[in-house]
């Protein structure tokens, strides 16, 4: 994976009701820098993974997947997620949350770069 200025780290577990809105809120971000998305799913038993795979098919270069092969729990899933990116900064979002501002990443990045 090429080093990017920022990686969005997105953690999920059985978030089928929310994951689409969350992913849309991430992918609507407008920035003047490159960023990627790392998704760590903790062996969801609902349709969360299928929905994530639909987005991966649409954005294969932007989205990287960590699909646990068994339920490892939130702590290990989080550790696997935040140690995966090779970026200067990380922005974090949970699978049952979403962003409302399309410039959220740009604003965060600008503040961190000051």
Which role does the model predict for each range below?
Residues 1-114:
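Nucleotide-sugar donor-binding/catalytic module of glycosyltransferases
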């Amino acid at each position: 994976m090429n080093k990017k200025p920022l990686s969005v780290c997105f953690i999920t577990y059985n978030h089928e009701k929310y994951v689409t809105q969350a992913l849309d809120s991430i992918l609507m971000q407008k920035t003047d820098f490159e960023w990627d998305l790392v998704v760590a799913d903790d062996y969801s038993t609902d349709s969360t993974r299928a929905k994530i795979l639909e987005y991966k098919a649409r954005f294969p270069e932007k989205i990287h997947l960590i699909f646990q092969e068994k339920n490892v729990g939130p702590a290990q899933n989080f550790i696997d997620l935040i140690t995966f990116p090779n970026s200067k900064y990380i922005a974090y979002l949970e699978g049952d949350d979403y962003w409302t501002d399309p410039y959220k990443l740009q604003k965060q990045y600008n503040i961190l770069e000051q």
